[in-house]
Amino acid sequence: MRRWNGWGDDATSMNLGEGARAMLAARLGPGLPGQDALRADLLARIPPSRLPEHPLISRESSERLAMALGESYADWIRKRFGALPPVPDGVAYPESGEQVRELLDLAHANRWMVIPFAGGTSVAGHLDCPVSDGPILSVNLTRMNRLLHLDKSSQLATFGAGTPGPLVEAQLRAHGYTLGHFPQSFEYSTVGGWVVTRSSGQQSLRYGRIEALFAGGRMETPVGPLVMPTFPAASAGPDLRELVLGSEGRFGILTEATVRVTPLPEHESFHATFLPDWDRAEAAVRALVQRKLPLSMLRLSNGIETETNLTIAGHERLVGAMEKYLAWRGCSAGKCMLMLGVSSDKRTARHALREARRLLAQYGAVYIGPAMGSKWAANRFKGPYLRNTLWELGYAADT
């Protein structure tokens, strides 16, 4: 079950070893654990709904509370300390674009405020309910979560906007395709949410940011539908897709998103490299990008993040041995970790990795190999779970 006042599934957690705890205490001082607010106390303070009964709308307090907050630091503090914000008066769960249209017509006729909701991972305050004299309706799109159409000829896939990342990939991979969009919130964020927030994924170097992947779709606005055909190009006039990208629900509710997909790569691997310092690391990454090698990912950590990641990883004996080897090779204090990925056919992947290593060596890089990369890939979406662990130890962390 998803945590009501923290990140992710309550069956998943990330532990911090003694080394990581000692580092926190040395850098930040002792933690100050607090007493969390009780969910029951918050629910008891929720005012009655101002919405009438409707078959698509729930007025249950527990559901209204869940829709009122995202995952920003401010949201986190409100949940943990029981600072109850304004909550929606009801939550609708449409299963089709037609039901979204019905809800918007109803809201328009009765002057209700509408806030779209899907993955609930917003960190920019776009789920906040303002103080309002009229009712506020949250429209939860998570039941619109299917692959609606796959055009293999044009490599276009149409999804219900509430389809979360794991379902996007599972439904595409069943047909031999991938979208290749992997934000850190992948576990819960949705394809529609990616579009309306202009999301960037961890492998955007290969597949492109969401604005490059978004080919068209359908948005229901208060005054009618906005249909965006999947024309490959236009020589004149504004691109309606640009109105939707980054719109955060201001113009309407995206109900369908058509995205450009790619056949699954024959080979995919991730590789860890270390560079002596930030200046050389930055220059090396710039050179790699400008060389336009067919890499799928370049993820550079500065010295502090590198030290933190290695400490959090545990395996103190293995990490210690690696640190000694890196120091012997010229990467000691202030070193920066670069994680690079290749996602292509095997021949292209070998060529890209060979050329990348050759270029990186000019900047003093030390290649460690795919073992650390595989470990990173296996845990790539678990980073936000550290927020729960840190809070229990008395530290607050933003995204």
PLM feature segments, named:
Residues 90-95, 270-276, 338-342, 399:
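Short, well-ordered beta-strand elements within core beta-sheets of diverse protein domains
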Residues 53-79, 282-399:
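C-terminal substrate-recognition/cap domain of FAD-linked oxidoreductases
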Residues 139, 215-219, 242-246, 252-261, ...:
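Short beta-strand elements
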Residues 145-301:
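FAD-binding subdomain of flavoenzyme oxidoreductases
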